[in-house]
Amino acid sequence: MADNKGRRDTFDVSGDTNTNATSNKRSIEDKIEADLDKIMKKGSFTPADALELYNKYGDENEYLVDKILKMNSKKNLKIRKQARLLAEKIYQRYNNGTKPLHEILEKMLKYKKENKWSDKEYDEFRKELTNLLTGNRALEIDYNQNLTSYKSRINRALGGIKNEEVIRQADSGLRIKDSEKGVLQDILNMYDRTANLHRTVFMHSLMYEDCSLVAITGEFDRKRHLATNYIDPILACMFIPKIDIFEIHMLYANFGSIIKARSERKQITNEPDLLLYYDITSDPNDVVCEINSPIADLRNRYRVQIALWGIVMKLRNGNYYDSEAMDDFSKTLDACRNNLYDNADLAYNNDEGAIMRRLLSVFSLRPTIIVTKPVYSIASFAMGQLMPQLIMGANGVPSPFGQSMNPFNNQPIYTITSIPMITLQIPPITDNAEPIDLRSATTQTLWVNENKTIIPKEQSIIYSKEVLIFYINRRIQRIQLKTFSNPLSFSQLPLTMSSFERLNGYPVHVPDRLVLDRGDEVYNLRSVVSVTETKIGGLSTSLVEGLPSNSILGQNSQSTGIITGRTGLITKPRNFETGVFEPEYYLYDPFGASLPVRHPDQSGYFTNKPISHIPPLYSPSVDLTGGIENPSFFDRASRTGTIFIYAKPQGYNPNQPLSLF
């Protein structure tokens, strides 16, 4: 019998496990995609929609997350293409230099309002326009990637390519040394270990509603919780409210996913990862968590992000006490540093503002776009003072003034840059003080590091991506003359009680609604980080007995305010769709929940909740509260508020395609 050459045997695949699994996977993916298409036809994706999908496909979490991200990426890719067309049109119109960039952006804010663009859409236009600027026009953008002088180590390590090219092609991948391969493997291992955690955080964020009832009704249990091991109020003020830009950059995006894609020379098509990639490669601070190695810097940032994921999950489930989670977060964040680029005069502060700056620097989140110009021409002014005969005025006549009369020497140079937060300086004297309006910080003078020199510059805000973050330094250093004749022993009391650092209670007017002059952008107050003041001194003999005579408590018979901690003030704005007809105000004070409080009628003691309702304006008299001070929401914000977070009610995500004009 002849051999059956070329004959292909057939096999029964009905029992093939791999084939069945593949078929089931495709079937589930098709169902998820069909359900997502139905939802997107409505025009929005709500937490209720996310909850419905999660209940239906909870066991297929990996497929669900992947489909949602792909759906979002397709939509944003279309927006990016439209933004590029518009940017090219504007570039061609104004490339002759007749109009500076900050005036172009201000003009486009009017179109933003008229065409109802979202912050996401406007920001894509700004990115595309700035990427087109070359030559002298590129100097208008601080740290423009088109400048040859821009040498971002993070950018080089990740391949040194632009955001646009990441979408279109896979190139040479990471550019790291052989000695750094071990760090890369650590990052990839961290990604594998935390993949399920990230998917859980992502789905939980989609389902989470602003100031969820679960998040604000947690309890303190003395048998299970240690009151001092509470989650930092700074994180509560960022993540109990739902603010899109924090969700996208810190929860949706994944440092590990970016590194994995670049190491495998694959495209980055995940929209949150693309936004994070753009920010970390265009950040003027460059490395922030490790000076010697950019890939080690990214590993440290990834550690902060992983620790943050765990804390947010606990916080939003009403668990405000976890020493292990906070210890991990604090250790990883402390490895990162403050920078000299933003508010150089505050670079060595170690307070609430420093923590916030470090956290924002980890994610290179710089939402506020500002225009700066020198207060005056320092170089020409100094030259005029030292050698006025060399400063020539009109018609070759030496100028008798300090500055040159040459308009090209003294013409202010406008620069567009981005900052993480806005600093408002307050006076140290609080007696009979007139409140300063927080809005005055939108146009002010600040100190910046330019070419390794700290100089003053006048800044004004062009616009801000969804959030406006203000910072006030509430810690004031006061030295009493009597401490020189009777010095204080630092081994006897904590540093915060050393008489050098106390609360600066200068009043600040805090509006619940803030409108920027350019573009009429509206921001609502969402949360305030407030420092806690403890009154010491003026105590009874029994309490002071045993303390050294040269200590504060031994010296002072008068009450002294000492900063001993911080709390969070959170507001939930009105929302007629969810049945919130008036704003609600909350106090996040997990440590205070452990302290017994005497009942006003002297009938006993009670304890407050970790998160409790607080009146917005009315502060009851101490006579009515049994001698207990209970300031209102805005009283606390005015006197002790240090970080103020405002957000746009419409969020950051795009709602409709970008309109061309």
From Swiss-Prot:
Subcellular location, record wording: Virion
Extent of Polar residues compositional bias: 15-25
Coiled coil regions, renumbered to chain: 112-140
Chain intervals with Basic and acidic residues compositional bias: 1-11
InterPro entries with a match to the protein in the record: P4B
Top-rank taxon: Viruses
Protein name: Putative core protein L410
Organism: Acanthamoeba polyphaga mimivirus
Record lineage: Viruses, Varidnaviria, Bamfordvirae, Nucleocytoviricota, Megaviricetes
